[in-house]
Amino acid sequence: MATTQLEYARQGIITDKMKEAALAEGVSPEFIREGIAAGTIIICHNIKHGNGRPLAVGKGLRTKVNANIGTSADDTDITKELEKARVAVRHGADAIMDLSTGGPVDEIRRAIIAETNACIGSVPLYQAALDAVRTKKKAIVDMTVDDIFEGIIKHAEDGVDFITVHCGVTRSTVERMKNEGRLMDVVSRGGAFTVEWMAYNNCENPLFEHFDRLLEITKAYDMTLSLGDGFRPGCLADATDRAQIHELIILGELTQRAQAAGVQVMIEGPGHVPLNQIEANILLQKRLCHGAPFYVLGPLVTDIAPGYDHITCAIGGAIAASAGADFLCYVTPSEHLRLPSVEDVREGVIASRIAAHAADIAKGVKGAMEKDIAMAKCRKKLDWEGQFNLSLDPEKAQRLRAESGVAEHGACTMCGEFCAYKVMDDAMEKQRAAGH
């Protein structure tokens, strides 16, 4: 008997969630079903997420954008994180990941889930680590295997739609990293926790060793596995090295095991990657992971732009998505510097939405060009309201025009009376009047 979207799809059954996703994407329900059955499309929606909107991610669909929010040990203001969630969704984020590591994390997660109907992701390992330190008064390395899985169940029960789990961080991958040498070692927080735990306990990664236990939990909630890249490169110099690719090979093997068990999977990717290596990274992931949806952090194309990493992210994200990545995790101007502000979240979401939209045009996603064509028509007519309504960020567009002073001639203050549109309109009108 089918219990997950993947199992229903493989039995030829179109579910209500598939129909809802198809309507949102402008494709047929059968297109969604076929993609899910093949493992190239997923629908992120935990059966416990009552107010949640099913989110389809994958081949042939619009590129999605995720916004990371969450507290830290230094900033535990819940109201601020809820405002970030609202702002992210208002500006077009498709998903929100709660990465809270400070304050009442259970309360924060539940409040974020209640605040929005967007798709919600999390990293349950953070919860297990925090509980070990704060509740049990121990260290991260004192987490038990049961602690880790209890954290996963807690997030599943709360209605989290997808969880990042660093199952590919194994002893063999750590050895490859050591043997080859890396400039920045492990920059993934979950990956670092796992490596530390493995070294201290002289044991294999519990999420790898007990992967079947993980599948039982996620299948029960139809919760999507986002197989995390614990060895993602944290600088350009470490991109596409043996540790990164070895982990990707393992994730490809785990993808097959998960799909065989009826569990939906996506793969997380880098990271910091030079422009000329991005397409190769996408090709490798799609080949090694059997076409599973690819969820990338950036990638950032240079390491020297702190304060502007939403731009380095958008550049890499546009290239990655045009090459086949399906899901972009935003980066804010505060990346590498501080916990992002509400304004940082807004800028990060918009930057990644620009990248996603540009890539969708390049990929030929159905309907991707329609707004661009409409915008061109509005610009030609100097229809400012139409331009604002079509903008990715109408508020900023309106503000900038208002600040410059609205000219009587209807053009902008860049060209004024020498506006090319007005000049051409006058020229064409004169030709018509002359009978030409």
Curated annotation (Swiss-Prot):
Record: residues binding [4Fe-4S] cluster: C412, C415, C419
Q: Does the keyword Transmembrane apply?
A: no
Q: Write out the entry's keywords from A to Z.
A: 4Fe-4S, Iron, Iron-sulfur, Lyase, Metal-binding, S-adenosyl-L-methionine, Thiamine biosynthesis, Zinc
User: What are the names of the required cofactors?
Assistant: [4Fe-4S] cluster
Q: What is its EC number?
A: 4.1.99.17
Q: In which pathway does it act?
A: Cofactor biosynthesis; thiamine diphosphate biosynthesis
InterPro entries, alphabetized: ThiC, ThiC/Bza_core_dom, ThiC/BzaA/B
Q: Which Pfam families match?
A: ThiC_Rad_SAM (PF01964)
Which GO biological process categories is it annotated with? thiamine biosynthetic process; thiamine diphosphate biosynthetic process
SUPFAM superfamilies attached to this UniProt entry: Aldolase
Please name every pair of cysteines joined by a disulfide bond in this record.
Answer: none
The entry marks the following residues as binding substrate, namely: N68, M97, Y126, H166, S188, R189, G190, D229, G230, F231, R232, E268, Y295
Instruction: Please give the catalytic activity noted in the UniProt record.
Output: 5-amino-1-(5-phospho-beta-D-ribosyl)imidazole + S-adenosyl-L-methionine = 4-amino-2-methyl-5-(phosphooxymethyl)pyrimidine + CO + 5'-deoxyadenosine + formate + L-methionine + 3 H(+)
Q: Name one GO cellular component term.
A: cytosol
- Where along the chain is Zn(2+) bound? H272, H336
* Free-text remark on how the cofactor is bound: Binds 1 [4Fe-4S] cluster per subunit. The cluster is coordinated with 3 cysteines and an exchangeable S-adenosyl-L-methionine.
Q: Which GO terms describe its molecular function?
A: 4 iron, 4 sulfur cluster binding; carbon-carbon lyase activity; zinc ion binding
Gene3D superfamilies from the UniProt entry: 6.10.250.620, Radical SAM ThiC family, central domain
Give the UniProt family note: Belongs to the ThiC family.
Function in brief: Catalyzes the synthesis of the hydroxymethylpyrimidine phosphate (HMP-P) moiety of thiamine from aminoimidazole ribotide (AIR) in a radical S-adenosyl-L-methionine (SAM)-dependent reaction.
Classification via PANTHER family: PHOSPHOMETHYLPYRIMIDINE SYNTHASE, CHLOROPLASTIC (PTHR30557:SF1), THIAMINE BIOSYNTHESIS PROTEIN THIC (PTHR30557)
Describe its assembly.
Homodimer.
Q: What is this protein called?
A: Phosphomethylpyrimidine synthase
Taxonomic source organism:
Geobacter metallireducens (strain ATCC 53774 / DSM 7210 / GS-15)
Q: What is the lineage of its organism?
A: Bacteria, Pseudomonadati, Thermodesulfobacteriota, Desulfuromonadia, Geobacterales
What is the primary gene name for this protein?
thiC
